């Protein structure tokens, strides 16, 4: 007798109800292009820590190993003074901006910035160790400086970028973590904000939680969280708003090799080593290296050159929803830390005395952002509006559109005398003002609402765009053209001699 299989049958998942489509399917591009640029953007601060006497920031932390996340605010194209008003119908269409090109300008010379810790947890030099050191004492920390991993990054999208790092996780219900045990690790994804530290070569992790001794890494990251861009998560975004495209260059090599002082939490298994007659105790094997980014050169620069967006890697092909754009920049090739000294007396002695001078450290950043934006129109059909509402309801709200709720079949109470004291208060609550969804996040805001110009030939990036597209800029001044001959001159010319047959 035949019997059906008792194995579990797996049914394939159903097809998705709605399919994510590219913006090119419902966005129509026009031939109107604008140039916009920021002013010179400068930042000055201490490269290692912020100066906060009495919980008030006097000097911010500005390091060459921080993310610079620019929130670029664009004007509303539907309220824009357009040269041609016939390009769209305001009753059935809406206008949006599309980013088609940008150039991130960087000032300041190339340089290598160093960091360190005056009390770094470094025990032995395990790279060139001639003999074992004496038994470690209670405090073997030393003063060590190093240069970091070299990173250049430019990431563009219309939503904030995402970063990943390792933090302390929660143990399972059946498990427990005692004092001194290694905590469970958890991969955490969060928004990259302006001022967050990049991966310097010691890993993307929360050092405040996972290294509470504050001595295993340099000063600028020992209580911070180093984040690495979550490229996998942003690439998997169905709508592609967080990542139009990115440029990346990373390099590093291990410069020195040390080990840590402290009690080893996990001993080396006995089957991995043979103990010697004079070495019955296995030495410390908690190794680490100091990173180095090596040479910085102008031949490998990603900045101060234009980049054109023809096709984004996701479904959003450069459309700036919400009239905003996020540009994330990392450039460690200009991380020079300047040392500044100030005399403590009005007339210092002619003989050098180091106590008469105070030493300070500062780091400076210089940026210039230039963009090319193309005007686009969207025809508001029922299908397009439903799709936009599913993708981001805030888009239609910004265009003053709302969806009517379905009819309610329940019986509602309606009082006649609404202001009467005989009934409960019927005054509707005031509507809350729409808040910025990124209000609690820290970004470097760049306002371009009054920086748009259609005179492309008046700006460096605009001229590069005209040269790239082969479009000649119109000019009202004619240069190098000959004046046409007048009628009198042409009539006084000699007639041609006729050929005789």
Curated annotation (Swiss-Prot):
Cellular component GO terms, alphabetical: host cell nucleus; T=7 icosahedral viral capsid
Region (Disordered): 476-501
SUPFAM superfamilies per UniProt: Group I dsDNA viruses
Gene3D superfamilies: Major capsid L1 (late) superfamily, Papillomavirus (2.60.175.20)
Pfam family, one: Late_protein_L1
Annotated keywords: Capsid protein, Disulfide bond, Host nucleus, Host-virus interaction, Late protein, T=7 icosahedral capsid protein, Viral attachment to host cell, Viral penetration into host cytoplasm, Virion, Virus endocytosis by host, Virus entry into host cell
TM ranges: none
Sample GO molecular function, one term: structural molecule activity
Domain of life: Viruses
Family affiliation: Belongs to the papillomaviridae L1 protein family.
Described purpose of this protein according to its UniProt entry: Forms an icosahedral capsid with a T=7 symmetry and a 50 nm diameter. The capsid is composed of 72 pentamers linked to each other by disulfide bonds and associated with L2 proteins. Binds to heparan sulfate proteoglycans on cell surface of basal layer keratinocytes to provide initial virion attachment. This binding mediates a conformational change in the virus capsid that facilitates efficient infection. The virion enters the host cell via endocytosis. During virus trafficking, L1 protein dissociates from the viral DNA and the genomic DNA is released to the host nucleus.
Subunit structure: Self-assembles into homopentamers. The capsid has an icosahedral symmetry and consists of 72 capsomers, with each capsomer being a pentamer of L1. Interacts with the minor capsid protein L2; this interaction is necessary for viral genome encapsidation. Interacts with protein E2; this interaction enhances E2-dependent replication and transcription activation.
Protein name: Major capsid protein L1
Gene name of the encoded protein: L1
């Amino acid at each position: 007798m035949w019997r059906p299989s008792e194995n579990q049958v797996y049914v394939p998942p159903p097809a998705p109800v709605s399919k994510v489509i590219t913006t090119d399917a419902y966005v129509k591009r026009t031939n109107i292009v604008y140039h916009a640029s920021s002013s010179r953007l400068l930042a000055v601060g201490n490269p290692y820590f912020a100066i906060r006497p009495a919980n008030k920031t006097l000097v911010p932390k500005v390091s060459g190993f921080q993310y610079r996340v620019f929130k670029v605010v664009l004007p509303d194209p539907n309220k824009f003074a357009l040269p041609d008003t016939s390009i769209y119908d305001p009753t059935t269409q809406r206008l949006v901006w599309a980013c088609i090109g940008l150039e991130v300008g960087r000032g300041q010379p190339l340089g290598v910035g160093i960091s360190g810790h005056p009390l770094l947890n470094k025990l032995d030099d395990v790279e060139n160790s001639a003999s074992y050191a004496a038994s470690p004492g209670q405090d073997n920390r030393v003063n060590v400086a190093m240069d970091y991993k070299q990173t250049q990054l430019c990431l563009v999208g219309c939503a904030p970028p995402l970063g990943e790092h390792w933090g302390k996780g929660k143990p399972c219900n059946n498990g427990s973590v005692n004092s001194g045990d290694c905590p469970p690790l958890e991969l955490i994804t969060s928004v990259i904000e302006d001022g967050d530290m990049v991966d310097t070569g010691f890993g993307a992790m929360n050092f405040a939680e996972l290294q509470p001794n504050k001595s295993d890494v340099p000063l600028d990251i020992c209580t911070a969280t180093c984040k690495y861009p979550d490229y996998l998560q942003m690439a998997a975004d169905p709508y592609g708003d967080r990542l139009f495209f990115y440029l990346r260059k990373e390099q590093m090599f291990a410069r020195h090799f040390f080990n840590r002082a402290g009690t080893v939490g996990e001993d080396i298994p006995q089957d991995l080593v043979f103990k010697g007659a004079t070495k019955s105790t296995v030495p410390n094997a908690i190794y680490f290296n100091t990173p180095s980014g090596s040479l910085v050169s102008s031949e490998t620069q990603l900045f101060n050159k234009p980049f054109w967006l023809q096709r984004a890697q996701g479904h959003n092909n450069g459309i700036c929803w919400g009239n905003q754009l996020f540009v994330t920049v990392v450039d460690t090739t200009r991380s020079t830390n300047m040392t500044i000294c100030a005399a403590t007396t009005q007339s210092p002695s002619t003989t050098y005395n180091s106590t008469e001078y105070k030493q300070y450290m500062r780091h400076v950043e210089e940026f210039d952002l230039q963009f090319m934006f193309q005007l686009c129109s969207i025809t508001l059909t029922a299908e397009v509006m439903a799709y936009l509402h599913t993708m981001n309801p805030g888009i239609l709200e910004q265009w003053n559109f709302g969806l009517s709720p379905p009819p309610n079949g329940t019986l509602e109470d309606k009082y006649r005398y609404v202001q009467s004291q005989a009934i409960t208060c019927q005054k509707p609550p005031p509507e809350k003002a729409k808040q910025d969804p990124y209000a609690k996040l820290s970004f470097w805001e760049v306002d371009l609402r009054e920086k748009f110009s259609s005179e492309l030939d008046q700006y460096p990036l605009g001229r590069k765009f005209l040269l790239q597209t082969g479009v000649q800029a119109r000019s009202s001044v004619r240069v190098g053209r000959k004046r046409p001959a007048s009628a009198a001159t042409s009539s006084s010319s000699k007639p041609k001699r006729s050929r005789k047959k």
